[in-house]
UniProtKB/Swiss-Prot annotation:
It comes from Pseudomonas putida (strain ATCC 47054 / DSM 6125 / CFBP 8728 / NCIMB 11950 / KT2440). Belongs to the PqqB family. NCBIfam families: PQQ_syn_pqqB (TIGR02108). InterPro entries: Metallo-B-lactamas (IPR001279), PQQ_synth_PqqB (IPR011842), RibonucZ/Hydroxyglut_hydro (IPR036866). Keywords: PQQ biosynthesis, Transport. This is Coenzyme PQQ synthesis protein B.
Length: 303
């Protein structure tokens, strides 16, 4: 299985266009050793030719331009994208669909709840229906697994995560299973397994068991501290309120990942306020000391 990190930042990217927090300002001033990042998205393939896009970020055009296999040039109009899987209906995971309209129709896999959001509060399916067949919905059931024809050796097993629907959603304060998903993706030829959960607010025993069965854990790296947005003066909500488990402290993501010495562990969906973006910070050093990697745009993983 080929895993390509197209974007590794949380919503807004890094540096965020309107932010002057210590990270964003430091990056622009050249006083912070850090790497710019686009908004979170990955691509998966079983042959390096046919790709499944997981989430479509607002930065999708630049992400595709930066990864040559996404333009195989086999025809006058072409793309390496053969299907799209949406893990939720967040704006920073779905807006990229608008930029892919020239390539419609697209096979889009998502849950009933995500499809409901994307036909009501943010009606992308409706909006793009006039573009050469638009978005063709394939339902993700919350039980069992599914296979996408373009990559027949990849088996996708979805699992619901405890997190909120987007602020625009008609059921923002009425959560349902299927609002947010993680994925276990297995290459049935190599046996390699990826646990992918860029929005992970809580970890229970069932999830821990799944994580133990994976070879690579690509998980939520949004915040270092739960109250980071408040500390930095750029927000009022905590990480838990937004559905993100912070890395630091008792019960934090790093403590969770300490229990997985065998697995490759990678943080993704990193917010612009997170001090681990500063490559010279003690927080970054602590992450690396504990055997955890920080995802970056263009990162490639094979399982």
């Amino acid at each position: 299985m080929y895993i390509q990190v197209l974007g590794s930042a949380a919503g807004g990217g890094f540096p965020q266009w309107n932010c002057n927090c210590v990270n964003c300002k430091g990056y622009r001033d050249g006083t912070l050793k850090a790497t710019a990042r686009t908004q979170s998205s990955i691509a998966l393939s079983d042959d390096g030719v046919h790709w499944i896009l997981c989430n479509a970020s607002p930065d999708i055009r630049a992400q595709l331009q930066a990864f040559a296999p996404m333009q195989p040039a086999r025809a006058l109009r072409d793309t390496g994208i053969n299907a799209i899987v949406l893990l939720d209906s967040q704006i920073d995971h779905t807006t990229g669909l608008l930029s892919l309209r020239e390539g419609c129709p697209h096979q889009v896999w998502c849950t009933d709840m995500v499809h409901q959001d994307l036909t009501t509060g943010f009606p992308l399916f409706n909006m793009l229906s006039h573009w050469n067949g638009g978005l063709q919905w394939n339902r993700i059931e919350l039980e069992g697994s599914f296979v996408i024809d373009a990559c027949p050796n990849l088996k996708f097993t979805p699992f619901p995560l405890r997190s909120a629907a987007p602020p625009y959603s008609p059921h923002r304060f009425d959560p349902h299973p299927g609002d947010n998903l993680g994925l276990m993706v297995e290459d049935t030829r190599t046996g390699g397994k990826l646990f992918y959960a860029p929005g992970l607010g809580q970890v229970d025993e069932k999830l821990l068991a799944m994580m133990h069965g994976a070879d690579c854990l690509l998980v939520d790296g949004t915040l270092w501290e739960d109250d980071e947005m408040q500390r930095r003066g750029v927000g009022t909500r905590t990480g838990r309120e937004m559905g993100h488990l912070a890395q630091n402290g008792p019960g934090g993501m790093l403590e969770v990942l300490d229990g997985f010495p065998r697995q490759r562990k990678v943080l993704i969906h990193i917010n612009n306020t997170n001090p681990i973006l500063d490559e010279n910070s003690p927080e970054r050093a602590e992450v690396l000391r504990r055997g955890v990697e920080v995802a970056f745009d263009g990162m490639s993983i094979e399982l």
